[in-house]
Amino acid sequence: NYRKFLNCLNYLKVNETLIPDEFLNISFYPDPYLYDWKIEKGEKIGIISYKSLFLANEIEVNEKLNLQLRRCGLSPKTLFISTLKDHIIQKKLIEIFKKEDIKLIITTTSFSSSQIKNNELIENSTNIFTSLKIPILQLLSSNRSRKNWLNSSIGMNSSDLLMQIIIPEFDGRITTCPSAFKEIISKKNTLYSEITSYKADQVG
């Protein structure tokens, strides 16, 4: 949708003509959105990612993950969601994963879906990570480049450590090694900014 918006601006700037209908049609994606589901053999693995990444076409990590799981004889079931704080979305995820008999969850989402009051967890039957009673792996995506990661002696920086390890542990998620790094894909002088994208790491 954002790409269509930019195309509209280009038409107005250059031609000042009517914008083609193809750029005016807005796509709608349900929440959660099922992505790249196939009928295939193998144990089913649930994958949860933010829908904002899908809308920004930031899906290389998900595609590489699906590919590797299929090479291992597994069946990935990817869902893009807006948030895990919404109990309605969590309920939908639980229904889908129970119906599909998901054996393991891999999530790229940050924060925590658990509610905390007075430093204690509040029991919630609709919490996806506690009600399904299956292992949950936290896939780590570093906000630094792989080169900076390798040259650093501290490992995860403070923001990655907080958002992807410390807070998600409230959900009982199992921490993994970094599977993606934020790399510069182009530099635009007109934007005065570097354009970055998460790139899947073959080792992770």
Which role does the model predict for each range below?
Residues 1-204:
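An N-terminal assembly and electron-transfer interface module characteristic of large anaerobic redox
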